[in-house]
Amino acid sequence: MVHNANHLRHSIDGLKVGGHQASSASITTIMTALYFNVLKVQDRVAVKPHASPVFHAIQYMLGRQTEDKLKAFRSLGGTQSYPSRTKDSDGVDFSTGSVGLGVAMTLFASMVQDYTRLNEVVNKQLANVNEPG
């Protein structure tokens, strides 16, 4: 995907788009193990921002991403260089970027989930909604 974006896809100005190959290489084994052996449906992941090519490739292998979007990596209508809930179509759980918010978002989401479960917040709210008024 990164090779295609930098070398095969036509570029009017000849500039390369980058792609952070080392970041992708460093997380490939972990993400492969997670997505194909460990994660359950309810699990959520914040992908290391510079490893989005690995995330998008895995989503393609799972049938959640198109080849055309992979070929258009980092271009209009293609997959994003940082996973984005609003711009990517392949099930990004948390938008991440270069400022490291992914780690904080997953931590706080986990804390909120634990709090609501321990305090039965959701069940209490549903009970109040369903009570005859």
Task: Give names to the regions the model predicted.
Residues 3-10, 20-133:
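Cofactor-binding active-site loop characterized by glycine-rich and histidine/acidic residues
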